Swiss-Prot record:
It comes from Bradyrhizobium diazoefficiens (strain JCM 10833 / BCRC 13528 / IAM 13628 / NBRC 14792 / USDA 110). Transmembrane segments: none annotated. Belongs to the cytochrome P450 family. It comes from the Bacteria. Pfam families: p450. Coiled coil: none annotated. Heme binds at C376. The gene is cyp114. One of its GO terms (molecular function) is oxidoreductase activity, acting on paired donors, with incorporation or reduction of molecular oxygen. It is an enzyme of class 1 (oxidoreductase). Its cofactor is heme. The keyword rRNA processing does not apply. Cytochromes P450 are a group of heme-thiolate monooxygenases. They oxidize a variety of structurally unrelated compounds, including steroids, fatty acids, and xenobiotics. This is Cytochrome P450 BJ-3. Keywords: Heme, Iron, Metal-binding, Monooxygenase, Oxidoreductase.
Length: 429
């Protein structure tokens, strides 16, 4: 069998994604990958898929062609796996499990994390959105610049998770301060200092959730933690405390920084494409289309952080991925693949108008929440936060504009912001 030679010897995709040029704009490099090296083998031996069709297939094939790492196998990919609290927690999360364990855990949590139950949070989310916008209004009306990233995009998911988990807001702000640190420490090329910092933050989160679970067990309320503490399936199986902690840790990691980044990108789209703001002034279906296009254009997690292990030799595009190889998918690239989305670099909410969530009018799937058995449980929660925020920002601040150049965090994994300065412009200015 002829095997296409990749360009790993002269170009490592993960190193390139961490470069200043890619931090600023990764999409030209992703286009290069799709066209020249769509099944890329990095210097570390990891494989990275960049075409929509291959990524979509890999998502669907998880549990068949791919599996999660077996217990103890993380040491192949992370040298400190045996001693790292963060990596041990990662290994215990739902995202790392295969059927039948995955099936059992997913069933238990899905009973209390349905789309309908998340929709029931809309009034609370709307209240939080209104309060945060009230808080920044005086400064904006005085003509001052406001960092919308810090004052709104970061704060909203923190406060929503506090509501969801039934915990004090101040406690959530303290825990959330370490989430970005944990995520960077779990990257495929994280340094020892980054992993050590992640471990310290994870230990704090783990201890807090252990205490929270005990409080909910003795004094249950109408929140997701209380529901999970009492969750059981048809065999009266219950979640252990260790499973509960890893579940909550995984939910917070997967849904906090990424939601904040999506809010930032949505505001960026509002300001960069004023001709598209009309999508936020009409019915809910048009708002949903705007939200889906934001999620497609700028996936907050550019590639999958979870190792997917090939269960057999797999040939994609003339490249053989050997059995037991670690395969990751470049989600942000798949979302910009012209074979899936026409004119993919153009921001066009119409491509998602009147469709099922995540599906374009051409029947292609937006990849930011994954697909298949590991589809993101928090997808609806993120969508609701965006849908409740954007029309209110547009209505409250129709003259909102940039107050300076937004700055990004120097991350190869997360496409997130450090600052997003905005101010109000006088009408007609």
């Amino acid at each position: 069998m002829d095997v296409q030679e990749t360009t790993a010897a002269c170009r490592d995709a993960f190193a390139e994604l961490a470069s200043p040029a890619c931090i600023h704009d990764p999409y030209p490099f992703m286009r290069w990958l799709r066209e020249h090296d769509p099944v890329h083998r990095a210097a570390s031996g990891l494989f990275l898929l960049s075409r929509h069709a291959d990524i979509f297939w890999a998502f669907k094939a998880t549990g068949d062609a791919f599996r999660g790492p077996a217990p103890g196998e993380l040491a192949r990919y992370f040298s400190r796996a045996a001693t790292s609290p963060s990596l041990n927690l990662l290994a215990s999360t739902l995202a790392m499990k295969d059927p039948p364990t995955h099936t059992r855990l997913r069933r238990l949590i899905s009973r209390d994390f349905t789309m309908g139950q998340i929709d029931n949070l809309r009034p609370s989310i709307a209240r939080i959105v209104a309060a945060r916008l009230d808080g920044i209004t005086p400064a904006l009306e005085r003509g001052e610049a406001v960092d919308l990233h810090r004052e709104f995009a970061l704060a909203l998911p923190m406060l929503v998770f506090a509501e969801l988990f039934g915990m004090p807001q101040d406690d959530m702000f303290e825990l959330a301060a370490g989430i970005g640190t944990i995520l960077e420490g779990l990257g495929p090329h994280a340094s020892d200092p980054q992993l050590a910092a992640a471990d310290a933050a994870s230990a704090r989160v783990q201890a807090y959730f252990g205490d929270l679970i005990q409080r909910k067990r003795t004094d249950p309320r109408r929140d997701i933690v209380s529901m999970l503490v009492g969750a059981h399936d048809d065999d009266a199986d219950t979640l252990s405390d260790a499973e509960l902690i890893s579940m909550l840790w995984g939910m917070l990691l997967g849904g906090f920084v990424t939601t904040a980044a999506s809010i930032d990108h949505a505001v960026l789209a509002m300001l960069a494409y004023p001709e598209q703001r009309h999508w936020l002034q009409a019915d809910a279906a048009r708002v949903r289309a705007f939200v889906e296009e934001v999620l497609r254009c700028d996936a907050p997690a550019m590639f999958s952080s979870i190792p997917r292990i090939a269960q057999r030799d797999i040939e994609l595009g003339g490249v053989v991925i050997p059995k037991n190889a670690d395969v990751r998918v470049l989600i942000a690239s798949g979302n910009r693949d012209p074979d899936a989305f026409a004119d993919p670099d153009r921001f066009d909410p119409a491509r998602f108008y009147g469709t099922s969530p995540g599906m374009s009018t051409d029947g292609k799937i937006m990849l930011s929440f994954g697909h298949g058995i590991h589809f993101c449980l928090g997808a609806q929660l993120a969508r609701v936060q965006l849908a409740e925020s954007l029309p209110r920002i547009q209505a409250r601040f129709p003259t909102l504009a940039f107050a300076g150049q937004p700055t990004r965090e120097p991350s190869a994994f997360l496409r997130t912001f450090r600052t997003l300065p905005v101010r109000l412009h006088a009408q007609g200015s």
